[in-house]
């Protein structure tokens, strides 16, 4: 998984206080692949600049957004598969072009710049009940993992071994950041990653396939005068 240029660029992107990339990342698998190990290593690498949270809570709980203050990364290591009832805050935080209203219990609301990026791990994609817009899906980078081999024996010390190589991992991330900046914050997106977004977009909105199917609409059909 660590050979992905998209992942390399995104992890590098999470090291700086900028949202110019205007993307969040989802890493999706069937379970047991070890994808959440990435989050544990990043937490060790970034310290207090990263925290664990929930995309669902950020969108639906008015106090959860304050936990993003001063963070560069929020890791959702077991993403809730329920469709979001709304997406306003998620989209706003991913682009972060203005200060965000934050609330804490017993404290008057205040505004802050939020630079937290989202890295989510789950067994499915992030979907919305009502928002099927291009703006919602355009903000997502979706990577899929290879299935876990049936004969693979898990290494219980994998995280510790990776953390022993934190210096090399940091340099790898910085290489991705450099490439991203050189490309004006446009991520390298493989055909497979682009297809992942398209698949999720179509599965959440059957109208797309309906409109593109043959036999329902003939946009270029000519109507003769005799039929008018």
Annotate each language-model stretch with its function:
Residues 1-225:
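Feature primarily recognizes SF3-like P-loop helicase cores of small DNA viruses
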């Amino acid at each position: 998984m660590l050979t992905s240029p998209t992942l390399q660029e995104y992890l590098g992107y999470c090291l700086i206080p900028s949202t110019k990339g205007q993307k969040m990342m989802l890493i999706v698998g069937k379970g047991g692949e070890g994808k959440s190990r990435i989050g544990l290593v990043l937490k060790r690498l970034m310290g207090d600049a990263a925290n664990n949270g929930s995309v669902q809570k950020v969108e639906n709980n008015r106090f959860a957004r304050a936990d993003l203050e001063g963070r560069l990364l929020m890791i959702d290591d077991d993403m809730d598969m329920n469709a979001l009832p709304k997406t306003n805050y998620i989209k706003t935080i991913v682009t972060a072009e203005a200060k965000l209203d934050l609330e804490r219990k017993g404290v008057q609301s205040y505004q802050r710049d939020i630079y937290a990026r989202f890295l989510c791990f789950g067994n499915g994609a992030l979907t919305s009940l009502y928002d099927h817009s291009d703006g919602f899906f355009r903000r997502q980078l979706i990577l899929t993992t290879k299935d876990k081999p049936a004969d693979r024996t898990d290494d219980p010390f994998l995280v510790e071994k990776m953390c022993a190589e934190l210096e090399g991992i940091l340099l790898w991330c910085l290489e991705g950041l450099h490439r991203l900046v050189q490309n004006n914050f446009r991520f390298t997106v493989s055909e497979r990653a682009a297809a992942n977004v398209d698949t999720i977009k179509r599965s959440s909105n059957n109208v797309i396939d309906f409109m593109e199917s043959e036999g329902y609409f003939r946009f270029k059909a000519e109507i003769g005068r005799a039929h008018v």
